[in-house]
A protein has these predicted regions:
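Conserved residues in the N-terminal Rossmann fold of short-chain dehydrogenase/reductase
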Residues: 38, 61-62, 102
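Conserved Rossmann-fold NAD(P)-dependent oxidoreductase catalytic core, especially the SDR/UDP-sugar
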Residues: 80-83, 87-147, 151
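Residues in the short beta-alpha loop(s) of Rossmann-like NAD(P)-binding domains
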Residues: 40, 129, 232
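N-terminal Rossmann NAD(P)H-binding glycine-rich loop of SDR-like oxidoreductase domains
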Residues: 6-28
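Conserved Rossmann-fold cofactor-binding substructure of NAD(P)-dependent oxidoreductases
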Residues: 53, 59-80
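Conserved glycine-rich Rossmann-like NAD(P)H-binding loop of the short-chain dehydrogenase/reductase
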Residues: 26-43
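Hydrophobic/aromatic anchor residues within beta-strands of the central parallel beta-sheet
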Residues: 60, 100, 163-166
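NAD(P)-dependent short-chain dehydrogenase/reductase
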Residues: 137-138, 143-227, 231-240
């Protein structure tokens, strides 16, 4: 099967997507190894304790996508890379534009360069609907990141390597998203939930659907594709 006996590395692997992807792959496939590449040792420790049965298949690698040399070392012996690391909170990116560019743009280029200089076979980068006609810095950095990954296919030459993108909307229940925030406000006893505009709509996808779309990309990508699933939209007031 697709991921059996394969080594997969996830950048930003201790995030919501990384948790769900790791669990899904361990339950549905027999990978050789899953490498969690992230900056936070405490989150890695917590995640390791979530999967005690699979400790022989999990490897935790402290590192930052801003650090090319560290990432290149982590990529050695890896078959597939899922690039999920990003600064994604819109206000944080607006107030810290240089940091957003370092992670979301320079980090993407580091992933590309490390993949080109090791034996990686496929790279799937996670994107967002905010990269379409971006109106904020986060969306802008992800648009640039997408362009970099698509263009990287031109540099593969005779290498057995390709780059593709998975793009979806808001991930329901992911850390920092509106659903956990609404739950927090309800637990605090608030009688009203803060909604900027009652006409707002959002496109939503579950974490599992996001993982399945990434696996579809790994299976079907030839290089340069942007995979987009059809997902429903609804008003934020309906969610509230």
């Amino acid at each position: 099967m697709l991921l059996d006996d394969k080594t997969i590395l996830i950048t930003g692997g201790t995030g919501s997507f990384g948790h769900c992807f790791t669990r899904y792959v361990l339950e549905h496939y027999n990978p050789k190894k899953i490498i969690i590449y992230s900056r936070d040792e405490f989150k890695q420790w917590m995640m390791a304790n979530e999967f005690p049965r699979y400790k022989d298949k999990l490897r935790f690698f402290i590192g930052d996508v801003r650090d090319y040399e560290r990432m290149k070392r982590a990529f050695e012996g890896v078959d597939y890379v899922i690039h999920a690391a990003a600064l994604k909170q819109v206000p944080a990116c607006e107030y810290n534009p240089n940091e957003a560019i370092k992670t979301n743009v320079n980090g993407a280029q580091n992933v590309i360069d490390a993949a080109l200089n090791t034996g990686i076979k496929k790279v799937v980068a996670l994107s967002t609907d905010k990269a379409v006609n971006p109106v904020n810095l986060y969306g802008g950095t992800k648009l640039v990141s997408d362009k970099l990954f698509i263009a990287a296919n031109a540099y593969c030459g005779n290498k057995d390597l390709n780059f593709s993108i998975v793009r979806y909307g808001n991930v329901a229940g992911s850390r920092g998203s509106i659903i956990p925030l609404f739950y927090q406000f309800i637990e605090e006893g608030r009688s009203e939930l803060p909604i900027t505009d009652y006409r707002m709509t959002r496109f939503w996808i579950s974490l599992t659907q996001g993982v399945e779309l990434v696996i579809k990309a790994l299976a079907e990508a030839k290089g340069g594709e942007t995979f987009i699933s059809r997902i429903p939209s609804f008003k934020v007031t309906d969610l509230a």
